[in-house]
Amino acid sequence: MVDKTHFDVVICGGGLAGLTLARHLRLELPELSIAVIDRLKRPLPEAAFKVGESSIELGTYYLGQVLQLDPYFRKYHLPKLGLRFFMGKSQGPIEERPETGQSIFPLVPSYQIDRGRLENDLRDVVQKMDVELFEGTVVESITLAQADENHTIGCLQKDEQRNFTLTARWVVDALGRRRFLQSQLGLKRDSGHYASSAWWRYKGKVNVNDVAAPESHAWRNSSIEDRYYSTNHLMDTGYWVWLIPLGSGATSVGIVTDETIHPQNTYGQSFSQAMGWLQQHEPALWNFLKDKEPMDFLSFKNYSYASAQVFSHRRWSCVGESGFFLDPLYSTGSDFIATTNTVTVEMIRRDRAGQLTEADVQTFNKLVIDIIFQTCRGFYRNAYRSFGHAQIFTPKLSWDTAIHWAYTYQVYVQGFLTHPTEEMLALGERYRDLNESVQQLFIDWAEKAPPRDIYVRGDMTRMRFLQLLHLELAVRRDSQQVLDVARKNLDHFDALAQVLFWQAVEECYPENEMLKKRPWINTWRMVLDPEKWAESGMFDAETTPRPLDEMRDNFTGIFAPQNLRDRLVYNLSFNIMHWQKGFVHYNVVPALHHKLIFRKPAMWVRNLFITDHQPQ
């Protein structure tokens, strides 16, 4: 018997997106009546449950700060030592592969998450907050209301095979890949990114360090913190393999491929087939795993998809994977949960105040789908072909991270997601379009140039522009300051793209005469093929030329061996931060950061890392 059948908000789906939305609503709008419906009953299995086990900075900010769960994550889940990549040379020892990854835990935290543990705990949390949970219940229908009437949700309680109906002013689709409303309303779209995956879990610790030869002591000791705590990626042309530690003590392993290069039917039909694929493509990892028994095995073909609309002024929304999904690379899934949940809360807030307009919702859809989603889509579409090129993927990783921190993260934490302005939207379109141009450059570069090693172990803490953007994750500025910095950073991304373009030309067309001049170009129109330069309009620059030394220095040891100056200037600060197992980083920097930067405008900090020019 269902005691209560009408709610202010009914959330269809009790996974990570639905449960976090329920908590978010209860914290922000405590007067609401909220129900969550999910087909699964507790207890949910730990470890062998769902993927999406790794977070990055924006998702962590949402989970830890907005939802006030930071103490919980610190206690029950694992700290994340950033993203680590072993690129190319997949037939050899892992310790001899080009590597990019951090040696010390970053100042702004992120976590390795056991999804079963988290979702069990979140159900307990929201239930204690007086959220009504309908567990073991299937959503069979959603009838959207006309005008100001209530929505109707048809449900089936599985154990009793009993049908019942709920009504709500707001209905939220958090049913994940079932994409109930997207299917019903004809809103599904192709993402243009065709990739597939298979994954499984092992009991116990699978440490990437142990994949190396036993005598590789110097390589093991080259990272202050244990590589085990990173999201480890073993990559080559068309694929990557993940190793993720879980707080329950298990380890998640997955294969992810470009479907056009490594079809899912070559590895995704069974665990034994997946291991055979690893034996062929990642023999060192296969040799380490070959005698271990998996806890589970799952596979998904063409997992990526897009949407025409996820928010409606008619009082519905699609959050998390019920709207769109791009790729597990970079762990952006929780970022999109954060953005779609936060917009949903804002729409409900405005609706209760009688202030929600159709124009508001159109703007939210534009920001989330046309700008943030499409910018992130550029990171992945056709990009897997560069994964065996260490000299290309390392700057790509830096670029992708910088774009995400400089625009998407700042839009969220500085309040522009819920209160977007025309100027911030216009800047977002410029960031998106420049990103598309640079991503195409990476693709064309990888098709033309052979893979080669980088000259140092890549570590983004060596790159001053990324150091600055990482510090600025913690600042809080007024609207005008945020816009000013976004314009200045776009100026730097333009300069960074100039450096990347001429490096690509140097590697792909070393005899080209323009290398002697290296003129300033329009990076929004650049094309790598010299035969297309004249028609592209890329020599009609829209921005003012300026020195490129600062941007070029971000790639010291990547494009060419380090010279004496590089070793003195850039390695010195790196070595100071890593002295005595990171003593300065862990003890001195956090105190200064909290006193001088945390939740402050800290405009002065930019002068320590970069020279800002007047944006065009």
Show where each model-derived region lies.
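N-terminal FAD cofactor-binding segment of flavoenzymes
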Residues: 45-92
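Glycine-rich FAD pyrophosphate-binding loop
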Residues: 26-51
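Beta1/beta-strand and adjacent pyrophosphate-binding region of the FAD-binding site
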Residues: 3-17, 35
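C-terminal helical "tail/cap" subdomain of flavin- and related membrane-associated enzymes
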Residues: 347-615
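Conserved Rossmann-like nucleotide-cofactor binding loop
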Residues: 17, 21, 42
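FAD/FMN-dependent oxidoreductases across multiple families
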Residues: 237-239, 245-247, 259-383
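Predominantly flavin-linked oxidoreductase catalytic cores and closely associated redox partners
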Residues: 44, 125-284, 341
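Short beta-strand to alpha-helix junction loop
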Residues: 104-124, 263-269
